[in-house]
Amino acid sequence: MAKILVLYYSMYGHIETMAHAVAEGANKVDGAEVVIKRVPETMQPEIFAKAGGKTQNAPVATPQELPDYDAIIFGTPTRFGNMSGQMRTFLDQTGGLWASGALYGKLASVFSSTGTGGGQEQTITSTWTTLAHHGMVIVPIGYAAQELFDVSQVRGGTPYGATTIAGGDGSRQPSQEELSIARYQGEYVAGLAVKLNG
């Protein structure tokens, strides 16, 4: 059994929705055990509430549990072309795992969201840098998801990983195409993890 962790941070719910789609795709793969968790919130509760943050029910992960998984699919909103501060804070606590090589050879993939589309690819590739330092095997999705060829509408989605465009005010929710790409990413990564674990 290959253990897959979908680990995310979501303030307004877009990445949370994408995380569930990623997990749905991963759950299609026989031999995959899928867990969804989130990184801890670092904002003060009153500031989080004033900013319109959405309460989420996923359990909170700890850095120490990451070696328990064969693949980790990270989800983070874009903050100025980078991962969110909450995800950065979480990953900055993995120094002990890095020192011991605990994540070496594990699969890693990334999905993201942006307000207007700016920085979605940069967020994914800049997150890869941290994962590469851990010796993780980075898994992009390429162009196998046919939705990536559709240019008839505004949508997220890149060969690097699934994305969604939330709109400047956060009112746009992930489209069916974006969710389909996210499901593909989950299924693809889980399939690789099962093969490598087999």
Curated annotation (Swiss-Prot):
Organism of this sequence: Citrobacter koseri (strain ATCC BAA-895 / CDC 4225-83 / SGSC4696)
List where this protein forms a coiled coil. none
NCBIfam families assigned: flav_wrbA (TIGR01755), PRK03767.1 (NF002999)
User: Which family does this protein fall into?
Assistant: Belongs to the WrbA family.
Q: Tell me what this protein is called.
A: NAD(P)H dehydrogenase (quinone)
* Free-text cofactor note: Binds 1 FMN per monomer.
Nucleotide-binding found in the keyword field: yes
Record-level Gene Ontology MF annotations = flavin adenine dinucleotide binding; FMN binding; NAD binding; NADH:ubiquinone reductase (non-electrogenic) activity; NADP binding; NADPH dehydrogenase (quinone) activity
